[in-house]
Structures are given as structure tokens and as C-alpha cells.
């Protein structure tokens, strides 16, 4: 590889197929193309709608987990050997698809994220390869199927993000990251103003990653 790297980090969405992966090989290949950071999207499987709930790290004492893998354990071991950095996603939750102004779902997600973070911090909070934390729930500035364009939903979303981020920062000095979807049919200036309102209420959020949906239209209305 002789060119200039255009990306220095990648996301990975873990599942059981990675249980035998050779992470030394994967991380060495990443370093060869200028990638020195992997973002683990979820510490658990995004499978709330099934009876099985998988954890990608071990051990865990969380009562809802039914199956444990040691995938992240092996990733951290290999990351240290290969000079790789890892940003760790927390609980794989989701927002309400019907009403974003009800507090119950936010409260549920706060508690789940705290519990997952506490276990992850106990395992790797002082690990040399830990580069940060990732709040997994993806939101957007549109209105499909529901959104947060108006109050009180906007501030409820911001309060949720800040609550989780502040809890993380109370124990760990590492950066807290999010990756929402940008500009789902909204004009760019309105998108910027909307995110400005979110960030004004979330001082403990450090990094916004541009999701692959950035700039996409055809969600709230068609554009020729």
C-alpha cells in the first residue's frame, strides 16, 4: 500500500461467526492500509426480538444475557499485541418507533447502558488499547417513522445521551462517541441547527461519526 490513508477507523458489528476469528491477522491487515482503530458497534447482540440474548464479552452477570462469547476478550488481547485501538459500543438498544416523547424507553436504555458499561469498564477500563466508548442507539434529524425535530422529544433525546455520557465520564476519561444519521431529507442548514441544539445539551459527547446515510434524501420527501 503506497497511497495516503483516507480512513483511520472502521466499525464492526459482532455476531457469533467471529468466535474463531484470528484478530492478529485482521489487525495487521488494517494497519497496513492505515486503519488503527476499530469501533465495536455493540457489546451484545442486537436481538431483543428473539429469546436469545448474546454477550460478546465474558464474563457477564447481566440477568438478560443467555449466551456468552469471548470475542471482545480476544480482540483486546490482539489489539495490544498489534498497537490497535478499540472504541467499545455499549448496550444495543433502540428508541421508540411510535412515540419519542415517552420517558419510559429512555429510562430503560439509561439503566441498561449503565449496567453494560460497568462490566466493560471493570474488564478493560484501564486497558492500553481502549480508545473510547460508543452510545449505540442511532437517531436522525428526520421524521421517519417518528423523530425528534420538535420539543419535548429533542430535549428528551439530548438528556438521554448526556445522562449516559456523563455516567461514562464519571468513571472513564476516554472519549464518548455517537453516530447518528445526518440530513434525512432536511435542508443542510436546518440539519445543522438541529444538531446544534442537541450538542448544546450534551457537553460530555466528544465525537460524532458520519454514518453512511449522511446526505441521503428520499426519506421524508422525494427530491429530483
Give the predicted meaning of each segment.
Residues 1-224:
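Glycan-processing catalytic domains of CAZymes
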Amino acid at each position: 500500500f503506497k497511497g495516503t490513508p483516507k480512513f483511520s477507523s472502521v466499525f464492526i458489528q459482532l455476531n457469533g461467526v467471529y468466535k474463531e476469528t484470528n484478530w492478529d491477522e485482521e489487525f495487521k491487515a488494517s494497519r497496513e492500509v492505515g486503519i488503527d482503530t476499530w469501533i465495536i458497534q455493540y457489546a451484545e447482540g442486537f436481538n431483543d426480538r428473539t429469546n436469545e440474548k448474546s454477550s460478546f464479552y465474558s464474563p457477564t452477570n447481566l440477568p438478560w444475557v443467555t449466551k456468552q462469547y469471548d470475542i471482545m476478550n480476544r480482540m483486546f488481547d490482539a489489539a495490544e499485541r498489534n498497537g490497535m485501538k478499540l472504541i467499545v459500543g455499549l448496550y444495543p438498544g433502540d428508541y421508540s418507533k411510535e412515540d419519542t416523547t415517552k420517558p419510559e424507553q429512555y429510562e430503560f436504555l439509561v439503566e441498561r447502558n449503565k449496567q453494560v458499561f460497568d462490566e466493560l469498564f471493570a474488564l478493560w477500563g484501564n486497558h492500553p488499547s481502549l480508545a473510547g466508548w460508543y452510545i449505540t442507539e442511532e437517531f436522525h434529524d428526520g421524521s421517519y417513522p417518528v423523530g425528534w425535530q420538535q420539543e419535548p422529544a429533542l430535549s428528551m433525546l439530548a438528556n438521554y445521551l448526556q445522562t449516559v455520557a456523563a455516567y461514562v465520564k464519571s468513571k472513564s476519561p476516554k472519549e464518548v462517541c455517537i453516530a447518528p444519521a445526518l440530513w434525512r431529507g432536511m435542508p443542510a442548514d436546518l440539519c445543522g441547527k438541529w444538531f446544534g441544539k442537541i450538542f448544546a445539551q450534551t457537553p460530555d459527547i466528544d465525537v460524532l461519526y458520519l454514518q453512511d446515510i449522511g446526505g441521503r434524501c428520499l426519506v421524508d420527501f422525494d427530491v429530483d
